[in-house]
Amino acid sequence: SGSDGGVCPKILQRCRRDSDCPGACICRGNGYCG
């Protein structure tokens, strides 16, 4: 606990690139983090 290094938070967030996304999320083709 305390570290979410490999976790992708379950929030809907728009993005253009992976670095726009929190945690271990990547920017998916639909324009949202996942």
UniProtKB/Swiss-Prot annotation:
GO terms for biological process, alphabetical = defense response; negative regulation of serine-type endopeptidase activity
Q: Which UniProt keywords apply?
A: Disulfide bond, Knottin, Plant defense, Protease inhibitor, Secreted, Serine protease inhibitor
Gene3D superfamilies, A to Z: 4.10.75.20
Q: Where is this cross-link: Cyclopeptide (Ser-Gly)?
A: 1-34
Keyword Secreted appears in the UniProt entry: yes
Q: Where in the cell is it found?
A: Secreted
Entry PTM: This is a cyclic peptide.
- Disulfide connectivity? 8-25, 15-27, 21-33
Site: Reactive bond. Where? 10-11
InterPro entries from the xrefs?
A: Prot_inh_squash, Proteinase_amylase_inhib_sf
Organism domain of life = Eukaryota
Supply one GO CC term from the record. extracellular region
A Pfam match: Squash
GO molecular function terms attached to this record? serine-type endopeptidase inhibitor activity
Family in the record: Belongs to the protease inhibitor I7 (squash-type serine protease inhibitor) family.
Functional note: Inhibits trypsin; probably participates in a plant defense mechanism.
User: Can you quote the domain comment?
Assistant: The presence of a 'disulfide through disulfide knot' structurally defines this protein as a knottin.
Which protein, by its recorded name, is this?
Answer: Trypsin inhibitor 1
**What organism is the protein native to?**
Momordica cochinchinensis (Spiny bitter cucumber)
